[in-house]
Amino acid sequence: MKKIFILGALLFITSIPMVSCTDDDDKDPNFMPPDIVMGGGDVESEYPEDLPVPGASVVYAPSLNANMYRPISVKYSSAYPPISSWKTENTRIIAYMDGYKPAIKTLKAYQESVNKYGSSTTLPKQAATGRFYTKKIDGRWWLVDPEGCLHLERSATSLRKGTSSRNKAAWNSRFGTDEKWLSTTQRELSEIGFHGTGAFCTGTYSLIQIHNASNPSSPLTLAPSFAFLSQFKSEKSYNYPGGSDDNAAGLVFYNGWAEWCDSYLAGSAFADYLRDPNVLGFFSDNEINFSSNSSRILDRFLAINSSNDPAYVAAKGFMDSKGVQSVTDALNNEFAGIVAEKYYKAVKEAVMKVDDKLLYLGTRLHGTPKYMEGVMRAAGKYCDVISINYYSRWSPELTTAIADWEIGRASCRERV
């Protein structure tokens, strides 16, 4: 059975919208929030005094167990300052879940409950293979770390040096050397529960590997990101289909795509990551535009002016095979799945030829594609982990169509 694990974007921190909570005069001076984990060592710290007071207890609708919680009201905006318009939503924090009582209240207790990868040492241990892998246990998919411990990846993306004079001055003042920078970063991140790095650590991946080699008991996991489509375009001297990078996915129909994936994975770009036990896996691209709310991929490819463009030829051939003239959402979903299948298949088959233990984390699906059955089906067929950039939502969605789709021989409901 194909192994898969759904990975939320919250595990790979990327961006935070502008947020404003309740004003000071809205707070109840007599309100006493519950205990939460904040402390260092074996000392429990006080709860921050400036958090907003929650509202009355309500049922959290998506909860399978009808759990109660006390919402806090959050004003947010995706606009850049100065902000003239705010949206308001209720959201949750763990401390305000009714009945929540933390089992671990101190840093010392936390450190005793996890290993060097941040994996649980209290949950049932699995086979230790020396590499990360996925495994389905009692109906739930897990990551298993190289030591055989069940693992929930918690990592920070974009760990890299800034380029401004202010960045450089601050870095030199506090760290001065790469060794101190990464050892300090690893320690400080691990103390708040983050044990790895994600995408976009440009210029830092090799430094992390040097740190890991020198500090085997306190590594940072890696999940390097690549740009397969743009690299393929550049190395083959192609243009984007129709001259637009929105159509980058159409490059999979161009001559040499699968062969190029083979050579790229066997080349210098991947050499340092193959068989490295601290590499969780890799992302081959980021947020591929398989469609958006305002732009369907099938429409875009059919609008390409050149009738010889391989992306246009593929789209036209698809429509001809259906015997139709007009694009529908259903046809677009099916065609997007064909494009995604061609993309993911080539990457996965290339991975298997060089390191069959290296997890393929997909392409950080974002926006419309994560709701498209054809795209998700293709990703589930070839990716070991389906990575989702889950933005613009204050709470998880339970009643999403993904729960009822079939991917491979098991339903998504079994895999989420």
Residue ranges and their predicted role:
Residues 234-250, 327-329, 366-367, 372-373, ...:
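Active-site clefts of carbohydrate-active enzymes
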Residues 1-19:
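Sec-dependent bacterial lipoprotein signal peptides
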Residues 15-53:
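Bacterial Sec-dependent N-terminal signal peptides
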Residues 198-205, 228, 283-289, 364-368:
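Short, solvent-exposed turn/loop segments enriched in Gly/Ser/Thr/Pro and often Arg
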Residues 67-216, 231-278, 330-333, 337-338:
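Active-site-adjacent substrate/metal-binding segments within catalytic domains
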Residues 334-349, 353-415:
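Glycoside hydrolase catalytic-domain groove-lining segments
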Residues 209-246, 276-280, 284-321:
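Aromatic- and acidic-residue-enriched segments that line the glycan-binding/catalytic groove
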Residues 196, 219-223, 278-283, 357-361, ...:
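Structural preference for beta-strand elements that scaffold enzyme active sites
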